[in-house]
């Protein structure tokens, strides 16, 4: 069973560590690995906007760099008045590294919406999309 309250609190805590001097849109993420460990992610902006990275990818890449390969759930918290879903780049990474993973979208008012990575990107580009076979580029 997933403790969504704990994941949401971890994402809120992470959100306080963001570097968002341009958008002023802090995002915190908390990713639950199959090991039971929680990996936090934050968005980090750069004056050269394309170099900015999102909280969701920071959490996933951090977990992957620590050897985690199974993912059970992700909570994403913003200060938006409505829910904010991951950007297209994050959706692509999520659907490849954690297909079908439950994702909780939440704001600071405590409103929540539960979805999953596959629903966020219904027609993904997958390893099989590479000429039909992974590794055949």
Residue ranges and their predicted role:
Residues 2-20, 68-137:
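C-terminal binding/interaction regions
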Residues 10-13, 55-62:
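Short, well-ordered amphipathic alpha-helical segments that serve as non-catalytic structural scaffolds
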Residues 23:
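Active-site segments that bind and position negatively charged phosphate/pyrophosphate groups
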Residues 26, 43, 75:
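Conserved beta-strand segments that form the floor/walls of ligand-binding pockets within enzyme
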Residues 26-33:
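Short beta-strand scaffold segments in enzyme catalytic cores
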Residues 32, 61-67, 96-97:
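Alpha-helix C-terminal capping segments
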Residues 37-38:
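Hydrophobic "anchor" residues
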Residues 43-57:
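Compact, glycine-rich, soluble single-domain proteins
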């Amino acid at each position: 069973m997933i403790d969504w309250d704990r994941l949401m609190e971890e994402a809120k805590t992470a959100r306080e560590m963001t570097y968002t001097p341009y958008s002023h849109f802090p995002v915190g993420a908390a990713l639950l690995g199959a090991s039971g460990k929680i990996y936090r992610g934050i968005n980090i902006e750069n004056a050269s906007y394309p170099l900015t990275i999102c909280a969701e990818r920071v959490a996933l890449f951090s977990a992957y760099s620590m050897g985690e390969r199974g993912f059970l759930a992700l909570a994403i918290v913003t200060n938006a008045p409505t829910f904010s879903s991951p950007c297209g780049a994050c959706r692509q990474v999520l659907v490849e590294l954690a297909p079908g993973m439950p994702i909780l979208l939440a704001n600071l008012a405590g409103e929540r919406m539960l979805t999953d990575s596959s629903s966020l990107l219904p027609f993904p580009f997958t390893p099989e999309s590479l000429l039909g076979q992974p590794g055949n580029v």
